[in-house]
Amino acid sequence: MHRKTLAELAAGLERREFSSVELTQAHLARIERLDPALNSFITTTPEIALAQARAADERLAKGEAGPLTGIPIAQKDIFCTKGVRTSCGSRMLDSFVSPYDACVVERFNAAGAVMLGKLNMDEFAMGSSNETSYYGPVKNPWNTATVPGGSSGGSAAAVAARLVPGATGTDTGGSIRQPAAFCGITGLKPTYGRVSRWGMIAFASSLDQAGPMARTAEDCAIMLQTMAGFDERDSTCVDRPVPDYRAALGNDLDGLRIGLPKEFFGEGLDPAIAGLIHAAVDEYRRLGAIVREISLPNMHLSVPAYYVVAPAECSSNLARFDGVRFGHRCENPTDLADLYTRSRGEGFGAEVKRRILIGTYALSAGYYDAYYLKAQKIRRLISEDFRRAFEEVDVIMGPTAPSVAFEFGAKSADPIAMYLSDIYTIAVNLAGLPGMSIPVGFSNGLPVGMQIIGGYFSEDRLLNVAHRYQQATDWHTRTPAGIAD
Amino acid sequence: MEWETVIGLEIHAQLATRSKIFSGAPTAYGAEPNTQACAIDLGLPGVLPVLNREAVRMAVKFGLAIGAEIAPVSVFARKNYFYPDLPKGYQISQYDLPVVARGKLSINVDGKALTIGITRAHLEEDAGKSLHEDFHGYTGIDLNRAGTPLLEIVSEPDLRSAKEAVAYMKKLHALVRYLEICDGNMQEGSFRCDANVSVRPKGQTKFGTRAEIKNLNSFRFVEKAINHEIARQIEILEGGGEVIQETRLYDSVKDETRSMRSKEEANDYRYFPDPDLLPLEISSGFIEEVKATLPELPDAKRDRFKAQYGLSDYDAEVLTASREMADFYETVVREAAGDPKLCANWVMVELSGLLNKDGLEITASKIDAAGLASLVRRIADATISGKIAKQVLETMWNEGGSADDIIERQGLKQITDTGAIESIIDQIIAANPEQLAQYRAGKDKLFGFFVGQAMKATQGKANPAQLNELLKKKLQ
């Protein structure tokens, strides 16, 4: 059953080829067997899963099922789940059991999906390799000596290893797209405001966005259909109708205007990846698309701007983890300052501390204008670059990441090198645009992802563009050796 | 050297919304600790704020009432600092772009009219409370207050004495209650004040170094703390010292201010726009909608009272000091259908005396406006004299009942029958031949003696005007 895509499983459930309980048990068994080597789950929730599966089977029997009813999924451990530990990959929240569900979790529950557990991630979503998790790194199923990418590395690895047909991720600077690329799966970061952030533990509020991670664009469409939509509890969530994503998948791509930004193909890009992207673009030409080179002149400013804005917001967002009301508290604090410094010192890992320090500095009196305000100006310039580009093209394509998955430890000593692995994805978050990554081939036996960027709220088009490519190619069906069975 | 004081006030008015500024939790005061705080107020991971429309409406109402500009776009910012009763580690406030800017308020001090500038008024959330008692060396945290909406009203440094500061604060206090945007309860902290105080040699234009005195929660403390601070600063300056910029706390028990933290120790709040909240846009339509709900404001009401009821400046000022007082007075006038000045006197002097004695607000008066009006009517129609009326009022206050019932039951009806009064006068004159002789010999003072005797004989019920007239005639 694990070989089937989410859409195929939904069809199987509908036809009663198997029950949700059977499906759930099969996936739980795979997790038990394969995940010790991968470490993609922080928490598994078999009891909840089986109860949800039984309820789903009843719904299916009554004919009250939707496309996600009875489908096993897993949540990135950044989403609050009622009664279940929600750790955010941090020692700080190792003991935190959320009293409420995130909006995304509520919506999957309402749709009748089955939650298998909570997925590993970089601590507080800060990282590009999953090496910052308090629960240890996730291994890339394609080569367990390499990283799965981050921060949604657990989600990407679990989907790639067929432990779950679909998982949620969050993307602040590439955290859905880059691990999707490293693990050879399909991931979509929606437009900022498309999916509610209620109950999603904030890293950088103006950049964070939840999205689906699955094997195919079609599966992402099914998941996004449930995730997207207005939620009055999130003031940044946009009240705008959600289109029928699956209905748009079949549209043909005749005359589709594709832009290739020259800034995405310059220095620092692995030539093998460049070759695969061009090959994928050629495939789009065959599907009727028109390709032209474009320019996003301020792209080189995106990483520095991001590493001011995101740490600034995180330094404030993470202030609530103070050992007073919930989360880690140090033993026997002597006074208030000791309680704060030791609880936070012990609870947070090195990368989180680095970003809190950078952000605190950037917001300090006397530095605010030079850093934070300037970064916000750059953000506007980058948005403007995209706005101009979308006057000429419908979608932008390029590499998702400059390299394939790297080995553990390769970049962990050099934060700048690590930050540059998000060089192509960060601008999309700064502009608030939707972006996808789809598998387009392999280099040295590791998957390569291509990024597709669209205008605001063009998720339907992105999914359509990705789906048509997946209809014509089979890169997305490749399965890591050793876990195929 | 002659010194001039410069004062600016920052007043925090708790807005009278039913729910909190960024959550749906109730704002009720006095509940069991941590029972009025929801996930958002607790700052749990993943929660997000949603702005309370009612709080914005109230801020706009205030802005309109002080003739201020209502910002078409204002921004919520995070003020970052660590404190156990600040759940998120930041307070959501407004910084660069407040919702209300550049208003003014007129005050009256010793008969002098002054206009005080209001720099800005912005919306923000309150923090919780740290409880240091009864926890065996630990500190308790009560987050019921966390997230309560506040309007911080910042004045220009236009005030020149503690007296002016108090007059300004009282005026503002009346205004927010007129507008029904704040209950004004100072004991519960619904209306509190920080004062920025500095002194400078008279004639100097540059401001002196200021000290900020925190958390003054009564008019009396504001006056005492400011006066104390002025004296402290002058003493330092006259001794050749320098005032240092710092935050000071007023100790009402010792009647002194003491240093809380210096400028160097001050927090760097690292303000930045809150990314969880979009800029607040206020349309002209919304402003018009709010404008339509504005009540008659204190100054307008005072002027109307003077014109409509012929009251003095002082009486009009006192009667419009609160909306409740003004409403009470106008009900008395309407019900009594008579002399507005007489009504003013009975509300301001006699009833207020009883209220003060029992420490009650006009809204808790034991005699309602209609009851007082019926008493005033009996004075106006000469059923009883003013002196008897005071007696009736006391009975109404202490025992309840209507004025007419009390007058009837106690037989207090004034004697207006000329024949009856004349016969009493005749008896008194007959009984006091000596005094009569002296009076007729020119000792005019004895007129009072005869009045007294007549009142004594009638238990004060003789109509005073009639009695005077008849006595004069008979004594001639």
Swiss-Prot record, chain B:
Domain of life: Bacteria
Catalyzed reactions: L-glutamyl-tRNA(Gln) + L-glutamine + ATP + H2O = L-glutaminyl-tRNA(Gln) + L-glutamate + ADP + phosphate + H(+); L-aspartyl-tRNA(Asn) + L-glutamine + ATP + H2O = L-asparaginyl-tRNA(Asn) + L-glutamate + ADP + phosphate + 2 H(+)
Sorted UniProt keywords: ATP-binding, Ligase, Nucleotide-binding, Protein biosynthesis
Keyword ATP-binding among UniProt keywords: yes
Keyword Translocase listed: no
Subunit description: Heterotrimer of A, B and C subunits.
UniProt similarity note: Belongs to the GatB/GatE family. GatB subfamily.
PANTHER family: GLUTAMYL-TRNA GLN AMIDOTRANSFERASE SUBUNIT B MITOCHONDRIAL AND PROKARYOTIC PET112-RELATED, GLUTAMYL-TRNA(GLN) AMIDOTRANSFERASE SUBUNIT B, MITOCHONDRIAL
Name of the molecule in the record: Aspartyl/glutamyl-tRNA(Asn/Gln) amidotransferase subunit B
Organism expressing this protein natively: Methylococcus capsulatus (strain ATCC 33009 / NCIMB 11132 / Bath)
